[in-house]
C-alpha cells in the first residue's frame, strides 16, 4: 500500500512468530475499540480534544492497515477465534459534517475467493472507505458454505480505471480481465407474487441492490472533475509524478448518470480542490482519489462547463431537420423508420369560364333551354353538345352489345325508400348497401292487412282545403314565389331562395286519392322510427358505418314527422325539379350526388349523378379534359382523380340536352362498366371494348416495352382449361363447356389465365323446346337468344392509332425517328393491341374469385316451383336449378372423391363418398338440387333507386334448398336448357381479368349469383360453400369433418 509516497513490500525469507503476530493483532483491535469508546464519551465535551485523539489513533493504526487487509492481523471475538471483517464502499456525507478518518474505517474485499499470495510478488492493496449506512445481506442457508472475502491484489504496473457501467445490474469499477467480481446472491421471494407487498419494501430492496451504481457514478464524476482541473494546479508541490502514476481516467465515462450540476464559477472549483489537497496533507493520504466525497462535490460544475458553450443552431437548421424527419414514418409493426410513400398527384379538371357560367345558369333555372345573347357562344355550345351526343351514343351502343339491355324499367318503391337507399349507398359497394336495405325490409315489413290507411292518410290541412288539384292559378303562384330573394347553397353553390314554405308547397303538389301500388313503401318506416337507434344499428351492422347512418336515417324520419305529421314524400314527384333538388339538399347527409341519384333513378327527373365509377370512366375516356399533370406523370399512372363535383360541372352543361331515358341508360351502363372493366386498380384494358378511344390505354400502351415489338411476337399465351375435377367423376356425367358457351377455343383470350372447367351435371340429351307453348311461357321464351344472335363488337383501329399518337405527343416520344413511330403504330389486329399485365404471384387466386356452375332453366309452370312465388312477368331472368354431385355437401368446396374401398356390392355410409352415392342415386333414379330465384321476383319488384343495385341477369340462391337440397326424379330435368352460372362475392371479382367473349356471353346467356335469400325471413344470406368459397376461406383448416 502507498503511504507518504513510499511503498511497503515483503522481503523473501522474512518470517514472524505466530504468537507475536497474534499479540499485535489483539493490541490493535483493543486499541481501536478503546478509541471508539473514547470518541463517543468525549464527543459532547470537547470537539477539539476528540479530533486530536482520533488523529493520533489514525497515525498509530496506519502501519497495521496492510496486515488487516491481507488477513494476517485479523480481529478475534470473545471466544478467541478470528472474526470476519466487513468492508464497505466510500461514505457520502451530508453538508456540515466532517468525514471519518479513512485509516479507522473497515475495508471491504472485492474478489470472490481467497487466493494464495506469492511471497516474491509485489502487490498493491487498495483500501476502500466505509459507507454511512449498514448493508443487510440475505441470510445464508444452513447447508451453504461460508465464502471468505479477501482483499483484491493488483499488480502495481497495471492501470487503475474508475468508471461506471450504465444500467448494469451489478455496478462498480472495471477490473482487469481474467479476474472475477463478487456478485451478491439474489434470492427471489416467490411469495411476493401471491401475497400483496408494500411498495416501500420493494423500493428498499431495490435501493440496496443498486446502491453501488450511485456511489460509483459520483466517484466517476469526481475523477472527471480532477482530470479537467489538473491543468489549473499543475504547479502544486504536493502533486508529483509518482503520485499521479495511478491516476488514469477513462475518457468514455457516461455523463448523464451524474446528478444535476449547479452553476458555479471557476474560482469556486479551484477553491474546493485546494480544500481536498489540504485534507490529503492532514490525513497523510497517497492521492486525491482517497479523499472522501461530500454531497456538494457532485453538485460542483465541471471546468468544461465554465468554458464558452457552443452557439445555438439556427432556426433554418432546425426546420430542415424537421422537414427531413417529416418524410419518415414509423411502422408500428416493425418499429423501424422507412421512407414515406410519394405524395399522389391529384388531377384537376380544366374548367373554362364559359363552362362555369353555364353551370351556374343551369343550377338556377335547372332547364337546358335558354337563349344566348351571343350567337357565336350559342353555336359553340351547340357544336360541343353534338360532339358529346355522338360519343355518348357510341358508348351506349357498345355497352348494349356487351352488357345487354339496360334501358329504363320501372321498379316499385316510394320516394322515402330512395332517400334511405342513397343513405345506404354512400361510401360502400352495391352488394353491402343492397344487403342492408333488404335486412331493414325484413326486420320492419309492411303489413298488407292494415291496408292503405297509412299511405292514403292525408294531413289535416289538406283535408280542410277546398281543392288540392293542380291548376294554372296554383302554378302561377309558385312561379311568383320563385322570383323572391336568392341565396347561395353552401353544398353546391346554387343560388336559391332564402325562405321557402315547404308546407304550402306540399299541400299544393299532393294529389288527392290513394297512392298507386307502384309507389308503395317497401318498409314500415313508422316502425323504424319508433324502434330506436340501437335496433337499426344492429340491423345494418354488416354494412359498416352503422352508427352514423342510423343516426341520419332516424333524424330524417323524425324531421318528416315533426314537420308534416307523417312520413310521405310522394308530393316531390309532382313538384318542379329545382325545388325537389333544393328540398333534398336540405336533408342532413344528402349531397349533390345523392340528390341527383334520387331525381334520376327514383323520380325520373332530368339529371345525371356522377359517382366514383362515372368520374373515373369520364376521365379515362377523355370526356373531361385535365390540367397538365406535374412531374411527367402519365395518364395510366394517375391514382387520385378529380372530385366528382368538378367533373359534374363540366359534364352537365354538355349533357343537359339529352333525353331522360338516354341519361338513365348512360348512367346504368357506366356503373356496370366501372365494375366489370374500368376498375380503379388493375383494369381489364385488353378486354375493354372502348380501348380504342381510351386515353388510359393509349398511355399505358405507349409506355410499355411491347410498343416496339414485332407483330409476330405473342403478347399472351392462349387460354387453357383443365380437365374434369376428379377422376372419380364419371365421364358420362361431365361435358365440355363448349356445349354451354362458345369460349373454349384457345384463341378467344388475350390473357394467359387458366380457368377451371364447368362441370355439366348430369349429362342428358339436349331436347328441342316444343313448338306449342303456353301463354305463360311467351315472355320467358322471348328473353333468351341463341349464341349466334349475340352481337359482335366492332374495333376501331383508326381511333386507336389516333389515341396512340396523342399519347406519344404527351409523353414526348415524338422526337424519335419516324421508323420507330411507324413500327409502334403498326397494329394489324385487335388482338395485338394489348398492354402487358403483370401476372399475380398465384394465378389460381383470380380463378377462385368466381365459381362456375352449369344450371338448368326452369319454366314458370315446372313441377319443382310449386312452393315458390310466381315469377314476375317483367323479370328478365327465370328460375334456375343447380344439381348437386353425388357425395357433395353444403359445405364442400372441393369435388367429392371416393372415400371407401367398396367394389359396389356393399355401399358405405360416408356422406361425401362420391362412388357409393353415385350408385345410390342411379339405383334410386333421383337427383338433388338447389333452386335459384330471380332477383326481381325475390324482391317482389320493389327496391329503391329503381333496382340499379342489381344486375339485369342476377339471381339469388334459395337458402333452404342450399342447405337441404330438394330430391326429385331425373325425368324432370329432361328437355331443360342449360346455362352458365357465375357465383362470387362481388361483380368485380367475378369478371376479374376475363376475356371479352366470356364477359359478353355471361351477360347475354349466363347468370350471376352473389348471395342467398331466405324466403321465410326475406333477408339476405351468404352463399354456402358448395356454390362459392372465397379464396381466404379455402384450405384444410376450413374443411369440415365430412369433407376430410
Curated annotation (Swiss-Prot):
Residues 1-15 have a biased composition (Polar residues). Residues 1-107, 1024-1044 are annotated as: Disordered. Disulfide bonds: none annotated. It comes from the Eukaryota. GO terms for molecular function: 4 iron, 4 sulfur cluster binding; DNA binding; DNA demethylase activity; DNA N-glycosylase activity; metal ion binding. It is found in: Nucleus. It is an enzyme of class 3 (hydrolase). Residues 348-445 are annotated as: DEMETER. Keywords: 4Fe-4S, Activator, DNA-binding, Hydrolase, Iron, Iron-sulfur, Metal-binding, Nucleus, Transcription, Transcription regulation. The DEMETER domain, which is present in proteins of the subfamily, is related to the J-domain, but lacks some important conserved residues. Although strongly related to DNA glycosylase proteins, it differs from these proteins. The DNA repair function may not exist. Belongs to the DNA glycosylase family. DEMETER subfamily. This is DEMETER-like protein 3. The lineage of its organism: Eukaryota, Viridiplantae, Streptophyta, Embryophyta, Tracheophyta.
Amino acid at each position: 500500500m502507498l503511504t507518504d509516497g513510499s511503498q511497503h513490500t515483503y522481503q523473501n525469507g522474512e518470517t514472524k512468530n505466530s504468537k507475536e503476530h497474534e499479540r499485535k493483532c489483539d493490541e490493535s483491535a483493543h486499541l481501536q475499540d478503546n478509541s471508539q469508546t473514547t470518541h463517543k464519551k468525549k464527543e459532547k465535551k470537547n470537539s477539539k480534544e476528540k479530533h486530536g485523539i482520533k488523529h493520533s489513533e489514525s497515525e498509530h493504526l496506519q502501519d497495521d492497515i496492510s496486515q488487516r487487509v491481507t488477513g494476517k492481523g485479523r480481529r478475534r471475538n470473545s471466544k478467541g477465534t478470528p472474526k470476519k471483517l466487513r468492508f464497505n464502499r466510500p461514505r457520502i456525507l451530508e453538508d456540515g459534517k466532517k468525514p471519518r478518518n479513512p485509516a479507522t474505517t473497515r475495508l471491504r474485499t472485492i474478489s470472490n475467493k481467497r487466493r494464495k499470495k506469492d511471497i516474491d510478488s509485489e502487490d498493491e492493496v487498495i483500501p476502500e472507505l466505509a459507507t454511512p449506512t449498514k448493508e443487510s445481506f440475505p441470510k445464508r442457508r444452513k447447508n451453504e458454505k461460508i465464502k471468505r472475502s479477501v482483499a483484491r491484489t493488483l499488480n502495481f504496473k497495471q492501470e487503475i480505471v474508475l468508471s461506471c457501467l450504465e444500467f448494469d445490474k451489478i455496478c462498480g469499477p472495471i477490473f482487469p480481465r481474467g479476474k472475477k467480481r463478487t456478485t451478491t446472491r439474489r434470492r427471489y421471494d416467490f411469495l411476493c407474487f401471491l401475497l400483496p407487498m408494500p411498495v416501500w419494501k420493494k423500493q428498499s430492496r431495490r435501493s440496496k441492490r443498486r446502491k453501488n451504481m450511485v456511489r460509483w457514478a459520483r466517484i466517476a464524476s469526481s475523477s472527471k472533475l480532477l482530470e479537467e482541473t489538473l491543468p489549473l494546479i499543475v504547479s502544486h508541490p504536493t502533486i508529483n509524478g509518482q503520485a499521479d502514476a495511478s491516476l488514469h481516467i477513462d475518457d468514455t465515462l457516461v455523463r448523464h448518470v451524474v446528478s444535476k450540476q449547479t452553476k458555479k464559477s471557476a474560482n469556486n472549483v479551484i477553491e474546493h480542490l485546494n480544500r481536498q489537497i489540504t485534507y490529503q496533507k492532514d490525513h497523510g493520504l497517497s492521492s486525491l482519489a482517497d479523499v472522501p466525497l461530500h454531497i456538494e462535490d457532485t453538485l460542483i460544475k465541471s471546468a468544461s462547463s465554465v468554458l464558452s458553450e457552443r452557439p445555438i443552431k439556427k432556426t433554418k437548421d432546425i426546420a430542415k431537420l424537421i422537414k427531413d424527419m417529416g418524410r419518415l414514418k414509423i411502422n408500428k409493426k416493425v418499429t423501424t423508420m422507412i421512407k414515406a410513400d410519394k405524395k399522389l398527384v391529384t388531377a384537376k379538371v380544366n374548367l373554362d369560364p364559359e363552362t362555369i357560367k353555364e353551370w351556374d345558369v343551369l343550377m338556377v333555372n335547372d332547364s337546358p333551354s335558354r337563349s344566348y345573347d351571343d350567337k357565336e357562344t350559342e353555336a359553340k355550345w351547340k357544336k360541343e353538345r353534338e360532339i358529346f351526343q355522338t360519343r355518348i351514343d357510341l358508348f351506349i351502343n357498345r355497352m348494349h352489345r356487351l352488357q345487354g339491355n339496360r334501358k329504363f324499367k320501372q321498379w316499385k318503391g316510394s320516394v322515402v325508400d330512395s332517400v334511405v337507399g342513397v343513405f345506404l349507398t354512400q361510401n360502400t359497394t352495391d352488394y353491402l348497401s343492397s344487403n342492408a336495405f333488404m335486412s331493414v325490409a325484413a326486420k320492419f315489413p309492411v303489413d298488407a292487412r292494415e291496408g292503405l290507411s297509412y299511405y292514403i292518410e292525408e294531413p289535416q290541412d289538406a283535408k280542410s282545403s277546398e281543392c288540392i288539384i293542380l291548376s294554372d292559378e296554383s302554378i302561377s303562384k309558385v312561379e311568383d314565389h320563385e322570383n323572391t330573394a336568392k341565396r347561395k347553397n353552401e353544398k353546391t353553390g346554387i343560388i336559391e331562395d332564402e325562405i321557402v314554405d315547404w308546407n304550402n308547397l306540399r299541400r299544393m303538389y299532393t294529389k288527392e286519392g290513394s297512392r298507386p301500388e307502384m309507389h308503395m313503401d317497401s318498409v314500415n318506416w313508422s316502425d323504424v322510427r319508433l324502434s330506436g337507434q340501437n335496433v337499426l344499428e344492429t340491423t345494418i351492422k354488416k354494412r359498416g358505418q352503422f352508427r352514423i347512418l342510423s343516426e341520419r336515417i332516424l333524424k330524417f324520419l323524425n324531421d318528416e314527422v315533426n314537420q308534416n305529421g307523417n312520413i310521405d314524400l310522394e308530393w316531390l314527384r309532382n313538384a318542379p325539379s329545382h325545388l325537389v333538388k333544393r328540398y333534398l339538399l336540405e336533408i342532413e347527409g344528402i349531397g349533390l350526388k345523392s340528390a341527383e341519384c334520387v331525381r334520376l333513378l327514383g323520380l325520373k327527373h332530368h339529371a345525371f349523378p356522377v359517382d366514383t365509377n362515372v368520374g373515373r370512366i369520364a376521365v379515362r375516356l377523355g370526356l373531361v379534359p385535365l390540367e397538365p399533370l406535374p412531374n411527367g406523370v402519365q395518364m395510366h399512372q394517375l391514382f387520385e382523380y378529380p372530385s366528382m363535383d368538378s367533373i359534374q360541372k363540366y359534364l352537365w352543361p354538355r349533357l343537359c340536352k339529352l333525353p331522360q331515358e338516354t341519361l338513365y341508360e348512360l348512367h346504368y351502363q357506366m356503373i356496370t362498366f366501372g365494375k366489370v372493366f374500368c376498375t380503379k386498380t388493375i383494369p381489364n384494358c385488353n378486354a375493354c371494348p372502348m380501348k380504342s378511344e381510351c386515353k388510359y390505354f393509349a398511355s399505358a400502351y405507349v409506355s410499355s416495352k411491347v410498343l416496339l415489338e414485332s407483330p409476330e411476337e405473342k403478347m399472351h399465351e392462349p387460354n387453357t382449361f383443365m380437365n374434369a375435377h376428379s377422376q372419380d367423376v364419371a365421364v358420362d356425367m361431365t361435358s365440355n363447356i363448349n356445349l354451354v358457351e362458345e369460349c373454349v377455343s384457345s384463341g378467344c383470350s388475350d390473357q394467359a389465365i387458366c380457368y377451371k372447367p364447368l362441370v355439366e351435371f348430369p349429362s342428358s340429351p339436349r331436347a328441342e323446346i316444343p313448338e306449342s307453348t303456353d301463354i305463360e311461357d311467351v315472355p320467358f321464351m322471348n328473353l333468351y337468344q341463341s349464341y349466334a344472335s349475340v352481337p359482335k363488337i366492332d374495333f376501331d383501329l383508326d381511333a386507336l392509332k389516333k389515341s396512340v399518337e396523342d399519347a406519344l405527343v404527351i409523353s414526348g416520344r415524338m422526337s424519335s425517328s419516324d421508323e420507330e413511330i411507324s413500327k409502334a403504330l403498326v397494329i394489324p389486329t385487335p388482338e395485338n393491341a394489348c398492354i402487358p399485365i403483370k401476372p399475380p404471384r398465384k394465378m389460381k387466386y383470380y380463378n377462385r374469385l368466381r365459381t362456375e356452375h352449369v344450371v338448368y332453366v326452369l319454366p314458370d309452370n315446372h313441377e319443382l316451383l310449386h312452393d315458390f312465388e310466381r315469377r314476375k312477368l317483367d323479370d328478365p331472368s327465370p328460375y334456375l336449378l343447380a344439381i348437386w354431385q353425388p357425395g357433395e355437401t353444403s359445405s364442400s368446396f372441393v369435388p367429392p372423391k371416393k372415400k371407401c374401398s367398396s367394389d359396389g356390392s356393399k355401399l358405405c355410409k360416408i356422406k361425401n363418398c362420391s362412388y357409393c352415392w353415385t350408385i345410390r342415386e342411379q339405383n334410386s333414379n333421383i337427383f338433388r338440387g338447389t333452386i335459384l330465384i330471380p332477383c326481381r321476383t325475390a324482391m317482389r319488384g320493389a327496391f329503391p333507386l329503381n333496382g340499379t343495385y342489381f344486375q339485369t341477369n342476377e339471381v339469388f340462391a334459395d337458402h333452404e334448398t342450399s342447405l337441404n337440397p330438394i330430391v326429385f326424379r331425373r325425368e324432370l330435368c329432361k328437355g331443360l336448357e342449360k346455362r352458365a352460372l357465375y357465383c362470387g362475392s362481388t361483380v368485380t371479382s367475378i369478371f376479374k381479368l376475363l376475356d371479352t367473349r366470356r364477359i359478353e356471353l355471361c351477360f347475354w346467356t349466363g347468370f350471376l349469383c352473389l348471395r342467398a335469400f331466405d324466403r321465410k325471413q326475406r333477408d339476405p344470406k351468404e352463399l354456402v360453400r358448395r356454390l362459392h368459397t372465397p379464396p381466404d376461406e379455402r384450405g384444410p383448416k376450413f374443411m369440415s369433418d365430412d369433407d376430410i
